[in-house]
Amino acid sequence: SLVKNPVLLSLFVGTAVIATAYYTGYSYVEPYLQQIGGLSDEAITTSLMMFGVAGVIGSFLFARFYVGKRRRYWYIRASLAGVALALALMMPAALGGMGSVLAVFVLWGICGVSFNVAYQSEILRFAPPHAAAVATAIYSGIFNLGIGGGSAVGGAVSTAFGMGSVCFAGALIGAAAVAIACVFLIPAMRRTRPVE
C-alpha cells in the first residue's frame, strides 16, 4: 500500500536517484581532489571537516526554514539542485584551489543534509501511522542502495572516462533527481492530503 501512495513512491524513487548522484561524487572525492586539484592529504582532511560542519548548518537551516507548504516545496527543489550544482562545480573548484573546494563543500554539505531530512520529514508526514516505521526502513534501505549504486557508477565512470568525469556524472544524475521532484513529487504533495 505504501508504493500506491504517489508521494511516498516519488520520495522512494527520488531518494534512489539523489543518493546515487551524491555518492557518485562523494565516494571518490579524495582521489578526485588529489588527481584533479593536486591537494595535499592535510588540505583534503580539512576540506572534509568543513563538509561535516556544513552538514550541521544544514540541520539548523532545515529547522528554521522548512515550514509552510510553499517553503517546503522550494526547500526540496533548492536542496536537490544544490547537490547537483556542487557536483557540477567540483572540477573548477578543484582546479581553483582549497578556497574554491571549501566553498563547494559548504554548498554540498548543507544541501546534502537538507534533502535527507526533508525527505524523511515528508515520509513521516504522508505515511500512515501504522506503517511509518516500515516506510522509514524502506527509505533507509533505498538510501543505502543509492550509496552502493553511486560508488559503482563513480567507479565505472572513472574507469571509462577518467576521474575528472566522475562529478559531472553525479551532477547529471542529480539533475534527474531535481526533475523527479519537480514533475512528480511536488505535484503529488499538492494533490495528496497528509496523514493527520
What role is predicted for each listed range?
Residues 169-196:
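Multi-pass alpha-helical transporter architecture, strongest
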Residues 7-49:
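Extracytoplasmic gate region of multi-pass secondary transporters
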Residues 73-119:
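C-terminal transmembrane helical hairpin of 12-TM major facilitator-type secondary transporters
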Residues 125-163, 170:
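A late C-terminal transmembrane helix in Major Facilitator Superfamily
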Residues 36-54, 100, 134-138:
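Loop-to-transmembrane helix entry
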Residues 52-60, 147-148:
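Residue-level signature of mid-helix packing/kink "hotspots" within the transmembrane helices
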